[in-house]
């Protein structure tokens, strides 16, 4: 059985999806302490959403290329987590980008914050229904919520059956506690971690053990599954070789019988 050990061993690759009006670089920076906690077990892959978001100061003004959005759920091409019954402009383009990145990087799991966490929930559901090439082994969801876009309302009919860690603040006023709890309930056996703060990704020392335990468990499961797959493929290879050898051994006998039959006919 494979065991998680020290530096130099295989790590998990986790695709990290930022929140609304963030980008890959800003999210990577915000997760600095979190990444440091998990450096032994995880390599994070960051990608920016394809759509420029309207600047916070002047909605309707010129988009800031550094502020990005995975999709827009309002007709003015902005996004708000509490919006219900709206569109999902740009979602398909973001889905294709994330699928390409996942494939190119060889990722194992997903992590998301806020809008990115909402996206993670949708991706996990799509994967469970075989509607994406992505097959995440686990998910980490911070300040997540269910999408209220009309095209996403049927995404939550069946519970997602992969390990998941859900993190949210007791006093979050942007994505409230009940919104994050509603997303957690769409997973079969969610692990829930709360903190007393608001809308941010917590990385205080008191949570280190929880984070390390979760990712160490996922790495252990990944290594064991990989070991089992390798053993199965090796066994299949040996069986095929044995069958070919047996067929080769029988071939001269068949030829001899055929030759004997020809002689008798003469």
From Swiss-Prot:
The UniProt annotation puts the region (Disordered) at 231-266
Query: EC number(s) for this protein?
Result: 3.1.2.-
List, alphabetically, the Pfam families matched.
FSH1
Asked if the record carries the keyword Hydrolase, the reply is yes
* Hydrolase as UniProt keyword: yes
| GO CC term, one of those recorded | cytoplasm
The organism's superkingdom is given as Eukaryota
User: Where in the sequence is the active site?
Assistant: 114, 172, 199
Q: What class of enzyme is it?
A: hydrolase
**What are the disulphide bonds in this sequence?**
none
Q: Which UniProt keywords apply?
A: Hydrolase
- InterPro entries, A to Z: AB_hydrolase_fold (IPR029058), FSH-like_dom (IPR005645), LovG (IPR050593)
Q: Which GO terms describe its molecular function?
A: hydrolase activity
In the record, the note on similarity to other proteins reads: Belongs to the LovG family.
Q: What is the recorded name of this protein? A: Esterase AGAP003155
């Amino acid at each position: 059985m494979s065991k998680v050990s020290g530096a130099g061993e295989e790590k998990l690759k986790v695709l990290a999806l930022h929140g609304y009006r963030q980008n890959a670089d800003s999210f990577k920076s915000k997760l600095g302490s979190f990444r440091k906690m998990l450096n032994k077990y995880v390599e994070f892959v960051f990608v920016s959403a394809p759509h420029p978001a309207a600047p916070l100061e002047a909605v309707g003004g010129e988009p800031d290329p550094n502020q990005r959005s995975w999709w827009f759920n309002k007709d003015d091409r902005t996004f708000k987590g509490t919006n219900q019954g709206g569109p999902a402009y740009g979602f398909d383009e973001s889905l294709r980008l994330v699928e390409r990145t996942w494939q190119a990087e060889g990722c194992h799991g997903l992590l998301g914050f806020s809008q990115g966490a909402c996206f993670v929930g949708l991706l996990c559901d799509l994967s469970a229904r075989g509607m994406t090439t992505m097959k995440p082994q686990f998910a980490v969801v911070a300040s997540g919520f269910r999408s209220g876009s009309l095209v996403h309302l049927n995404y939550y009919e069946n519970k997602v059956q992969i390990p998941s860690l859900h993190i949210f603040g007791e006093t979050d006023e942007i994505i409230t506690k009940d919104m994050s709890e509603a997303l957690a309930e769409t997973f079969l056996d969610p692990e829930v971690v709360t903190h007393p703060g608001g809308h941010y990704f917590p990385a205080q020392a008191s949570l280190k053990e929880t984070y390390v335990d979760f990712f160490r468990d996922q790495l252990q499961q990944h290594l064991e599954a990989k070991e089992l797959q390798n053993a199965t493929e090796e066994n299949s290879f040996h069986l095929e070789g044995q069958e070919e050898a047996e067929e080769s051994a029988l071939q001269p006998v068949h030829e001899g019988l055929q030759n004997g039959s020809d002689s008798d006919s003469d």
